[in-house]
Curated annotation (Swiss-Prot):
This is Large ribosomal subunit protein uL22c. InterPro entries: Ribosomal_uL22, Ribosomal_uL22_bac/chlpt-type, Ribosomal_uL22_bac/org-type, Ribosomal_uL22_CS, Ribosomal_uL22_sf. Belongs to the universal ribosomal protein uL22 family. Keywords: Chloroplast, Plastid, Ribonucleoprotein, Ribosomal protein, RNA-binding, rRNA-binding. Disulfide bonds: none annotated.
Length: 149
């Protein structure tokens, strides 16, 4: 005979992302210039989405110089391609738009899934074992901040 336990229903409490964003935000949105943005995307990076997301959560809503310091000190493998992407976005901002690197601010850092590369590894007795290598697309948006008076 099986016995069933009566479990009281406990509603789940959802974490509000807006609260987390407000806590992490360093610059008020009224000081961000609306159309002064630089987009940079890197496609098909050989890395899991979850591993890249862990690093991107740390650099979102930070200044460029602070981001570079954080990424240099992070022990994760995902930090190096993201660091190259941030460097490239800042170089594009200074070269094409004449922005100052001290005023650049990361407003958007997102990662999305890409294709999965499938390979087969030979195993015992003539069998094969599938290997799935996931890839991701990373997008960084740098915004310029007005100087406070």
């Amino acid at each position: 005979m099986t016995s069933f336990k009566l479990v009281k229903y406990i509603p789940r409490i959802k974490k509000k992302k807006s609260v987390l964003r407000k806590l992490a935000r360093k610059v008020p949105t009224d000081r961000l210039l609306k159309f002064e943005r630089v987009f940079k995307a890197q496609k098909r990076i050989h890395m899991s989405v979850f591993k890249a997301q862990r690093v991107l959560d740390e650099i979102r809503w930070r200044y460029y110089e602070e981001t570079v310091m954080i990424l240099n000190l992070m022990p994760y493998r995902a930090s190096y391609p993201i660091l190259k992407l941030v460097y490239s976005a800042a170089a594009n901002a200074t070269h094409y738009r004449d922005f100052d690197k001290a005023n650049l601010f990361i407003t958007k850092a997102e990662v999305s899934r890409s294709t999965i590369m499938k390979k087969f590894r030979p195993r015992a007795r003539g069998r094969s074992f599938p290997i799935k290598k996931s890839m991701c697309h990373i997008t960084i948006v740098l915004n310029i901040v007005k100087k406070s008076k």
